[in-house]
């Protein structure tokens, strides 16, 4: 009887650990957005190699070269506030995108045509544009960078 209870408890423990463990190291969509798109401290104005450095530092050149990425150089609170601004349709057809009401300081990184992994080489373009981001969750936070216009 004691062995049977122990076996049942052990089985339940294995089941629970198998369900919980895969989610432990998983990056949330909001955290991924921050890692891939937020750079409140920096700016590309002073460095033509900004994108090469940032894409590597933010782990977007691991296994392959991410072809395009945009960094936003504004406070996170300002970017999060876009989630309550003008709603627009996302490129994928969903209706959870929002367009910034004002232009923001951004840097576009584009993989150069001749660049091949593992030597990812990017062009760096600094600009002021409106951004379109997808927001989800409770609280409603940025989870995807859709476009700059």
Curated annotation (Swiss-Prot):
Coiled-coil residues: none
GO biological process, one term: defense response to Gram-positive bacterium
Cross-referenced Pfam families: RnaseA
Region (Disordered): 30-49
Residues reported in the UniProt entry to bind substrate: 32, 35, 66-70, 91, 110
InterPro entries linked to this entry: RNaseA, RNaseA-like_dom_sf, RNaseA_AS, RNaseA_domain
Main location: secreted
Annotated catalytic residues: 37 (proton acceptor), 144 (proton donor)
Enzyme class label: lyase
GO molecular function: lyase activity; nucleic acid binding; ribonuclease A activity
SS bond list: 51-109, 65-120, 83-135, 90-97
Signal peptide: 1-25
SUPFAM superfamilies: RNase A-like
Catalytic activity from the UniProt record: an [RNA] containing cytidine + H2O = an [RNA]-3'-cytidine-3'-phosphate + a 5'-hydroxy-ribonucleotide-3'-[RNA]; an [RNA] containing uridine + H2O = an [RNA]-3'-uridine-3'-phosphate + a 5'-hydroxy-ribonucleotide-3'-[RNA]
EC number(s) per entry: 4.6.1.18
GO cellular component, one term: extracellular region
Residue stretches of biased makeup (Basic and acidic residues): 30-42
Family stated for the protein in its record: Belongs to the pancreatic ribonuclease family.
Protein name: Ribonuclease pancreatic alpha-type
Species name: Rattus exulans (Polynesian rat)
